[in-house]
Curated annotation (Swiss-Prot):
Function: Catalyzes the formation of archaetidylethanolamine (PtdEtn) from archaetidylserine (PtdSer).
One annotated Gene Ontology cellular component of this protein: plasma membrane
Coiled coil: none
Name of the protein described by the UniProt record: Putative archaetidylserine decarboxylase proenzyme
Subcellular location: Cell membrane
InterPro entries reported for this sequence: PS_Dcarbxylase, PSD-A
Length: 223
């Protein structure tokens, strides 16, 4: 069943058809279908194990996928806001195509201790644009360490929306923001996490397990 707002828009789009303006009616239906596809926000069910880390972004349609998994040092942009002690972390970067769900979700449960919006350019998000593109950082404190989610704008995606504020507690899988018309989301984890996905994986935000907290392990090999 269509949401009430969508049903209303469909009803409006039928008016030109009733008066013989078929081209206008078809155009309106096309625009409405696109907006419904883009702004869809399906429910997701996260796993129950508290040590699991889930994908913050979708990467399932067409070119959407996890395209970077690597260890990053203390010189990586914004990482000092995530790990103030100067340590490095593990980066899992997901490219979102314009056809993916664009709502971003909390990868872990914890307290939002820091957020920062950084103005910048709007280059294609496939390149290494973290230093230049507009971005938004959300840092979540957990019992296992801090986790950072970096929403990055791109050539098409020119608006980042943040749903949470500093001081709020989020549950894993909660909606924390949105990037309109695709782009990329970088997930930065503590070094002792165990990565459970590979480059090329196609995650589902709020459900796909991408890593596991492993506080007893000092170092994890990342390929």
């Amino acid at each position: 069943m269509l949401p009430k707002r969508a049903s209303f828009l469909v009803s409006v789009a039928t008016i030109p058809l009733l008066f013989g303006y078929h081209a206008i009616g078809i155009l309106m239906f096309t625009v409405i279908a696109f907006m419904m596809q883009f702004f869809r926000d399906p429910d997701r069910i996260p796993p129950s194990d508290e040590d699991l880390i889930i994908a913050p972004a979708d990467g399932r349609r067409l070119s959407g996928k996890i395209d970077r998994i690597e260890r990053v040092g203390s010189d990586y942009p914004l990482i000092d806001r995530i790990f103030p002690d100067g340590s490095g972390g593990i980066l899992i970067s997901t490219f979102m195509s314009p056809f993916d769900v664009h709502v971003n979700r909390a990868p872990v449960s914890g307290k939002v201790i820091y957020t920062e919006h950084v103005d910048g350019r709007f280059q294609v998000a496939r390149s290494r644009v973290l230093t230049e593109n507009e971005k938004n950082l959300i840092v979540i404190k957990t019992d296992y360490g801090n986790v950072g989610v970096i929403q990055i704008a791109g050539f098409v995606a020119r608006r980042i929306v943040q749903y949470v504020k500093e001081g709020e507690y989020v549950e894993r899988g909660d909606r924390i923001g949105m990037i309109r018309f695709g782009s990329r989301v970088d997930l930065v984890l503590p070094e002792n996490c165990e990565v459970l996905v590979k480059t090329g994986s196609r995650p589902m935000a709020g459900e796909t397990v991408v890593a596991r907290f492993n506080p007893g392990k000092k170092r994890v090999n990342v390929q």
